[in-house]
């Protein structure tokens, strides 16, 4: 695990990250966690675990790092500059395809958040209505593959749709009319933001239009950490699970703690987002512990990535996730 917090902070400051420290626990194991992006409702259980002392009770002194770019967390994890990172199932597969020995050790958001979103008087309510439209995305290869699969599934000729890379400007691209829809906006973030702006967004979720379901947000560690430090990781993952359980018990209190740690956030928006996202923090199978990942689901999504030539190495899929650190597992 990472040691020497001052040295680590110096190394990371050169990489353009913001580092958030939490109160140190004397004698606790220092551990660094890099978020996938800026703090938001998806991370509410992390901040709840900090506020409630769940990590401290587990003998861990957790330090949160906020990346300047969502592509950074797995790179920093690969380089050994953070102990664990939050990322996305497709990104884990892509990193493993390049030979990076990374493993997902828990799912935070257990279904896709990525959606097709449209606004205006001519809502796009079905994939078939994408015909003749301009669709904006962030330019990611797997988003292009999503669109191709969706169009094929809806029997829409790919040439009838113009794909436009709008970067992170998904909402402005929709509001300006530059695109008729976006693929990449989250139904629990951009769509709720548009609702609060009274823009009446229409949302089509990925798993409704031919894309195999996947875990949008996952906790990732190096395989060497899973092998060499399973006790620390197990304590971390299970403390995190207690944080998310507390969110389910009292979403308002959890949002209060999220906003207290990140004063720039809008409390009303975050509460709306947390309430919308809450069911996805837990398995649909109540017998499964928090963080559960379905091997069948990971294999099916990995096979889709292979079929789409996003990855070429079957080993990128095999053993990409493990449930052995979850409560009641692997003991």
PLM regions and their residue ranges:
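Secondary-structure end/capping motifs
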Residues: 227-308
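Periplasmic-binding protein-like
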Residues: 108-118, 199-226, 237, 276-280, ...
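C-terminal motif of bacterial Sec signal peptides marking the signal peptidase cleavage site
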Residues: 11-14
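Conserved C-terminal helix/tail region of periplasmic/extracytoplasmic solute-binding proteins
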Residues: 298-331
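Sec-dependent N-terminal signal peptides
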Residues: 1-7
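Bacterial signal peptide processing site
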Residues: 16-18
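Pocket-lining segment of extracytoplasmic ligand-binding domains
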Residues: 90, 169-172, 178-264
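Short, glycine-/small- and polar/acidic-enriched structural segments
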Residues: 22-167, 171-188, 204-205
């Amino acid at each position: 695990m990472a040691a020497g917090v001052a040295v680590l902070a110096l190394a990371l400051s050169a990489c353009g990250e913001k580092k958030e420290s939490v109160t140190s626990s004397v004698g606790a194991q220092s551990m660094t966690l890099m978020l996938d992006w800026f703090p938001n409702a998806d991370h509410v259980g992390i901040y709840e675990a900090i506020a409630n002392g769940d990590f401290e009770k587990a003998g861990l002194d957790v330090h949160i790092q906020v990346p300047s770019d969502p592509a950074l967390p797995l790179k920093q994890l690969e380089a050994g500059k953070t102990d664990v990172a939050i990322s996305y199932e497709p990104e884990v597969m892509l990193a493993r395809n390049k030979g990076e020995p990374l493993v997902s050790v828990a799912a935070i958001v257990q279904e896709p958040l990525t959606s097709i979103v449209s606004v205006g008087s001519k809502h796009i309510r079905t994939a078939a209505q994408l015909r003749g439209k301009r669709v904006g995305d962030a330019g990611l290869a797997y988003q292009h593959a999503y669109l191709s699969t969706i169009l094929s599934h809806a029997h829409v000729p790919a040439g009838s749709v113009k794909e436009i890379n709008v970067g992170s400007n998904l909402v402005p691209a929709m509001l300006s009319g530059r695109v008729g829809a976006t693929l990449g906006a989250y139904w629990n973030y951009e769509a709720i933001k548009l609702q609060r702006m009274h823009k009446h967004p229409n949302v089509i979720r990925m798993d409704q239009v031919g894309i195999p379901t996947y875990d949008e947000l996952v906790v990732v560690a190096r395989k060497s950490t899973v092998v060499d430090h399973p006790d620390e990781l197990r304590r971390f993952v299970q403390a995190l699970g207690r944080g998310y359980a507390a969110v389910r018990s009292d979403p308002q209190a959890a949002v209060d703690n999220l906003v207290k740690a990140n004063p720039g956030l809008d409390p009303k928006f975050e509460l709306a987002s947390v309430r919308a996202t809450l069911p996805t923090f837990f398995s649909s199978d109540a017998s499964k512990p928090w963080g559960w990942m379905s091997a069948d689901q990971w294999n099916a999504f990995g096979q889709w990535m292979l079929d789409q030539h996003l990855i070429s190495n079957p080993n990128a899929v095999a053993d990409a996730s493990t449930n052995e650190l979850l409560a009641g597992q692997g003991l």
